[in-house]
């Protein structure tokens, strides 16, 4: 079974842990290299969005993996990571985060964590994957930019719990090590865990598409972590990328 050998690199501040680790990866850094920053000045999320990363209030970290697999496996790695991070948060805090497909973690209706997987490919194989995790731990509502206050939260803002960031980092790395070993053997290893936390299943969602947005019923998650939806016309579609919003 594959085991990660963690090599930790800690910084007071970086522009982005993912950006920094991608540079190390391109220079030949070994699998298991981790970059952690106390703050990010240009934290990034999916689809080019910024990620607010205030000084000392969250966990901002990236992990380098070099799996022997097809490039198409990147989405399953991201989804398995989301499930593993949920498990780590629950272990330390006792609260159970939910997953919004594909990789956003929510607690009591607000986003507390984002996961960004960026990869390099050689032919049809993954050369490396950098998994970035941005987790809001003790961030207060007033610490977020005003435009994010209605959607963003933290473990503290949603529960009143003050959790030591070091304990969360340790738990996350432990869970990621177990997840990666399982994922290398079975790309859908955490599928059931993922589905149990994907509370949008059975609800109406809006699929945001270049061809026009549409409403659909979220029905299932496939073994490769596609989202199965049923349109109002009764057509079943499987989404492997894109953006959705959940109807309240």
PLM regions: where:
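Conserved RNA-binding domains used in RNP assembly and mRNA/RNA metabolism
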Residues: 201-248
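Preference for bulky hydrophobic residues occupying beta-strand positions
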Residues: 61-63, 99, 117, 131-135, ...
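Beta-strand scaffold of nucleotide-dependent catalytic cores
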Residues: 36, 114-116, 130-131, 141
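Acidic (Asp/Glu) carboxylate-rich active-site/surface patches
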Residues: 87-124, 134
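Residue-level signal for inorganic ion chemistry
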Residues: 17, 43, 61, 85, ...
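N-terminal lobe of the biotin/lipoate ligase/transferase fold
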Residues: 1-92, 111-113, 120, 163, ...
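Short, acidic (Asp/Glu-rich) active-site segment that either coordinates a divalent metal cofactor
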Residues: 124-156
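Conserved, helical-rich catalytic subdomain that frames metal- and/or nucleotide-binding sites
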Residues: 158-211, 247
């Amino acid at each position: 079974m594959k085991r990660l050998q963690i090599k930790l690199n800690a910084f007071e501040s970086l522009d982005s842990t993912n950006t920094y680790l991608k540079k190390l990866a391109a220079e030949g850094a070994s699998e298991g290299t981790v970059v952690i920053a106390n703050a990010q000045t240009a934290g990034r999320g999916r689809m080019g969005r910024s990620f607010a990363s205030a000084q000392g209030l969250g966990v901002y970290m990236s992990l380098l993996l070099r799996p022997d697999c097809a490039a198409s496996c990147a989405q399953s790695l991201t989804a398995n990571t989301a499930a593993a991070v949920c498990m780590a948060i629950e272990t330390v805090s006792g609260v159970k985060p939910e997953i919004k497909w594909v990789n956003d973690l929510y607690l009591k209706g607000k986003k507390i964590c984002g996961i960004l997987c960026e990869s390099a490919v050689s032919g049809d194989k993954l050369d490396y994957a950098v998994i970035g995790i941005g987790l809001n731990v003790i961030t207060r509502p007033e610490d977020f930019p005003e435009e994010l206050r209605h959607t963003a939260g933290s473990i503290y803002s949603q529960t009143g719990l003050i959790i030591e960031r070091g304990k969360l980092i340790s738990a996350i790395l432990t869970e990621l090590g177990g997840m990666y070993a399982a994922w290398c053997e079975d790309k859908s290893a955490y599928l059931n865990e993922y589905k149990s936390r994907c509370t949008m299943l059975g609800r109406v969602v809006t699929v945001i598409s270049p061809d026009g947005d549409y409403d659909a019923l979220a029905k299932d998650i496939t073994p490769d972590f596609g989202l199965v939806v049923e349109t109002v016309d009764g057509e079943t579609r499987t989404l492997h990328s894109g953006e959705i919003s959940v109807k309240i």
